[in-house]
A protein has these predicted regions:
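Beta-sheet entry/capping signal
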Residues: 1, 73-77, 109, 162-168
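Short catalytic/ligand-binding loop motif for oxyanion handling, primarily in non-cytosolic enzymes
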Residues: 9-11, 84-88, 177
Length: 181
């Protein structure tokens, strides 16, 4: 969940995004979510960085317990919803760069899907039927987002890795205390 900066003059807006984000100053918000991350958020306030960092830490404990093999990683699909139509590519670049610059994930391969990418999936699978876009995507009501995540495993299993047997959904503000568990 990504939104526009709280302060357009903030030094926390990545330089490569500053000019691209300015047109959104005058745009109305299209979608409302409970806790979107502003593009000018401090790193310690960024749920994506927080969640991925702690999930990777939890997986390191599972590795030490023998539940993951050497060089084995989980595939994590990150659904990237935005509050403003047109913000998708900016948000994609923002998230991609934050993960690359701030995290050294040892046990997670992250795959980011925004509305543009989910739309391409639907148009590829069903080129003559756009009705599915109302059901499958990451922006807007929770049902579309949930449907995307639910069917992502089926698509992943058919196209990427046939050995996948299960998936689960987490919010990145959740963490798992593996030492306690």
């Amino acid at each position: 969940l990504i939104t526009i900066p709280e302060d357009y003059k903030s030094n926390n807006i990545p330089l490569n995004l500053q000019s691209r984000i300015k047109p959104f100053l005058s745009k109305n918000q299209n979608y409302w979510y409970d806790h979107p991350i502003p593009i000018d958020a401090f790193d310690h306030e960024n749920e994506i960085l927080y969640g991925l960092r702690h999930l990777d830490k939890a997986l390191s404990i599972e590795f030490k317990r023998g539940n993951l093999k050497i060089n084995e990683k989980i595939s994590l699909i990150l659904s990237l919803s935005v509050t403003h139509i047109g913000l998708e590519e900016i948000a994609f670049d923002y998230v991609k760069n934050k993960i690359r610059e701030k995290l050294n994930l040892k046990f997670i391969d992250v795959f980011v899907f925004d509305e543009n990418r989910t739309s391409k999936i639907i148009n590829t699978l069903f080129p003559k039927n756009n009705d599915y876009e109302a059901l499958f995507g990451v922006n807007g009501n929770y049902g579309r987002h949930y449907t995307f995540l639910k069917y992502a495993l089926i698509l992943w299993n058919k196209v990427i890795n046939k050995s996948f047997k299960y998936s689960f959904k987490i919010d990145l503000d959740q963490v798992f205390d593996q030492n306690f568990l």
